[in-house]
Design a protein with these regions (language model features):
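N-terminal pre-ligand scaffold of iron-sulfur
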Residues: 1-59, 72, 77, 85-102
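Short glycine/proline-centered loop/turn elements that form peptide/ligand docking sites
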Residues: 81
Length: 102
């Protein structure tokens, strides 16, 4: 059974080509805006624990600000290894609310 929780207001979402951190139930998520499409993933890089939501977007990937690992926001896969990945989550906008499926 899916559980949708409010993660942000629409006005708080990152601009195109940006990522931002949001917290729901004491867990921090990375929300990225790539070409107008929003994606949500775990905020912690599997390499050294860097905050992905503080990174940049490059070639459609979220780049960890600590050591440059790049993640596909649709699959959570890291470029360095197909086995290195973060969890991804569905998000949707309803009116002014942005919801994440936990």
């Amino acid at each position: 059974m899916s559980d949708w929780k409010k993660i942000a207001s629409k006005s708080d979402l990152p601009g195109e080509g940006e990522a931002r951190e949001f917290t729901v139930n004491e867990k921090v998520f990375c929300v990225a805006n790539i070409d107008g499409t929003y994606s949500a993933m775990d905020n912690v890089c599997v390499h050294r624990g860097g905050p992905l939501g503080q990174g940049v977007i490059l070639d459609g990937k979220v780049v960890c600000p600590w050591h440059g690992w790049m993640y596909d926001p649709k699959t959570g896969a890291a470029d360095v290894s197909p086995n290195a990945r973060v969890a991804v989550y569905a998000i949707k906008v309803e009116g002014e609310d942005v919801l994440i499926e936990l």
